[in-house]
Amino acid sequence: IDYLKQRGISGEIAKRFHLGYAPAAWDTLLKKFKNSEDLLASGLLVEKSDRQGFYDRFRDRILFPIRDRRGRVIGFGGRVLTQQEPKYLNSPETTLFHKGKELYGLYETCQVNRQPDRIIVVEGYMDVLALFQAELPYAVATLGTATSRDQIVRLMSSTQEIIFCFDGDIAGKKAAWRVLEQSLDLLEDGYVLRFLLLPDGEDPDSVIQKQGRDGFITYLHKAQSLAEFLFAHLLVEVDLSQLEGKARLAKLAIPLIEKVAAGIMQHKLFEQLAALVNMDVATLRQVTLNNKNNSVKTMQKKLKKPRVSMRYSPMRLAIALLAQFPQIVKSLSEKQCNTLTRLELPGSELLLKLFFLLKQNPELSSA
């Protein structure tokens, strides 16, 4: 309780999220519930390395229950109160809990508003609590992993606007770009995706602690649209003052834009690209179409290469004939046999070996 108070979390928020505490003992759950099979299956127990018993997975940690859409607890996140590592520990994958599909705080967000206008995606449990505490009750967190495609789909089924919030360091920028790449082919007209990169080393919790609710909202208003983030990221790699830079930007951007479903959003992205490379949209789209057609034609040519007919040399035919009809050896005269021994053609050595094998073993057949 003291730790939560130090972090600015009220009793009301702790109650809303059903925060708990796992005692430091190694056998609290076994003493309380006895049934080790269910506890093991749910990930709350860990089997000892010598297989001689079990111990509690979560010890001396604040517990964050993770709920599914119906509010059922399917897993836990645990935060240490000491310097113990790891700082955060999640339930393992179980039949109920798949951390790549779940989002902490989504149930609580939808309890406030069944169809929220927007959802902020953050990286930590405490970030979610801090945002709810600051009366911004539309925050969810990934569960210690990179944002997955399944999580993006789940978010899109819950709201029309998603704001992905990351630390502004290199790792945060890379994580944000991965989210953008995974989102493109899911994006349809009507959805809004924005990207908020906080100052290096900051997260929503720390911003609210230092600058309050208004400080975070100021950052929120600066969140980049998908188009702004996409082109800002790509422009770092090119020099638009050079013709080659414009061509490279188009080469990098077009495959990404084409992943977006055909519609207004895709057209607007092409418009922005056209403006950056000083082309009109129609010409840019035509170049894209021509490149596609050329790629298809090249592939078709590769697929339609004429078969090369297999031509057999006389020596190869002789070996095949002898192997198929070994009785031929009996009909050859001594003079013909001597002629065979003087052959110096590719494959003649194999022909002679086969000939003498059949000569010495007349009972051999092609079978």
Model-derived features: positions:
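Structured, non-catalytic alpha/beta "coupling" segments that mediate domain-domain communication
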Residues: 57-79, 205-212, 216-218, 279-283, ...
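Conserved phosphate/pyrophosphate-binding and hydrolysis machinery centered on Walker-type P-loop NTPases
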Residues: 19-23, 57-59, 122, 239-250, ...
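Phosphate-handling DNA/RNA-contact segment within nucleic-acid enzymes
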Residues: 23-158, 162, 175-176
